């Protein structure tokens, strides 16, 4: 079983770490249970929310009303564990490194396999993830500190409200990456090309303006240092639905664990708008 400090190369091997189907197969075997930042870097990654069918319509409307933090990549039929538009062999019950099981708005377990919990009424939503634009940032020569340090990205609950739908409501969660000023401008330009994976940032600069008191204490993920000559840049984040689930308190729900994403067969460049 992997840990966040263990090198991905020691588990996957240098030759296969960029092969999405191979990475999913290792995850399916339970050999990698950590975050997926930097894995299969050419491939689209997704946040996951799994809800009973009787609550799926409200959540679908929540995503439609909040496309910045909740850009939908795929929605399954009730009870279907496959998502053929995202991967031919994909099985949502086994192919995430770690899941969160929710009951009445509280996380009660974080298993690596949800096969025993699967039900015929469950609907899967896959939401775009900012890990998918990191390849473009790195190709442009922009440093990403969490990848350099083999950490999960830092994520925070902001004071930016989302548009409610049914019982689903709550604050926008944002991910943060520090850049020097010139690199921050370039990062805005690059990520604007990817609206299906959150697009351009929602804020840069003073974190207090969006309700973040201490960058060293993220609500999800791992803290990274922001150097004196750097600016924190914040993107809408697909963990936002988990904040909404905590407010809606559905009887039963499953999500990905923050940072432990679904790796798809889609290529990042396929989502570029221009």
Swiss-Prot record:
The keyword Lyase applies. It comes from the Bacteria. GO terms for molecular function: lyase activity. Signal peptide: none annotated. Keywords: Lyase. Its EC number is 4.2.1.-. InterPro entries: D-Glu_cyclase (IPR009906), Putative_hydro-lyase (IPR038021), UPF0317 (IPR016938). The keyword Cytoplasm does not apply. Pfam families: D-Glu_cyclase (PF07286). Belongs to the D-glutamate cyclase family. NCBIfam families: PRK05463.1. This is Putative hydro-lyase Bpro_1776. The lineage of its organism: Bacteria, Pseudomonadati, Pseudomonadota, Betaproteobacteria, Burkholderiales.
């Amino acid at each position: 079983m992997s840990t966040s400090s263990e090198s991905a190369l020691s588990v996957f091997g240098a030759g296969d770490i960029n092969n999405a189907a191979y990475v999913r197969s290792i995850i399916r075997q339970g050999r990698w249970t950590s975050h997926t930042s930097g894995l299969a870097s050419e491939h689209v990654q997704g946040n996951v929310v799994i809800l009973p069918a009787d609550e799926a319509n409200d959540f679908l409307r929540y995503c439609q009303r909040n496309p910045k933090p909740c850009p939908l990549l795929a929605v399954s039929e009730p009870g279907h564990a496959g998502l053929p538009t995202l991967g031919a062999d994909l099985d949502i019950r086994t192919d995430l490194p770690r899941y969160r099981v929710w009951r009445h708005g509280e996380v009660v377990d974080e298993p690596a396999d949800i096969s025993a919990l699967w039900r015929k009424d469950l609907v899967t939503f896959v939401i775009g993830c900012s890990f998918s634009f990191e390849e473009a940032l790195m190709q442009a020569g922009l440093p990403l500190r969490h990848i350099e340090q083999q950490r999960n990205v830092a994520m925070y609950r902001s004071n930016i409200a989302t548009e409610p739908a049914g019982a689903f409501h709550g604050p926008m969660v944002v991910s943060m990456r520090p850049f020097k000023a010139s690199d921050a401008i370039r990062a805005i330009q690059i990520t604007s090309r990817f609206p299906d994976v959150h697009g351009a940032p929602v804020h840069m600069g003073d974190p207090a303006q969006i309700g973040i008191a201490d960058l060293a204490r993220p609500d999800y993920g791992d803290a990274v240092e922001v150097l004196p000559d750097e600016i924190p840049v914040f993107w809408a984040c697909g963990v936002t639905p988990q904040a909404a689930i905590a407010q809606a308190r559905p009887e039963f729900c499953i999500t990905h664990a923050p940072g432990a994403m679904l790796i798809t067969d889609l290529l990042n460049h396929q989502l570029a708008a221009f």
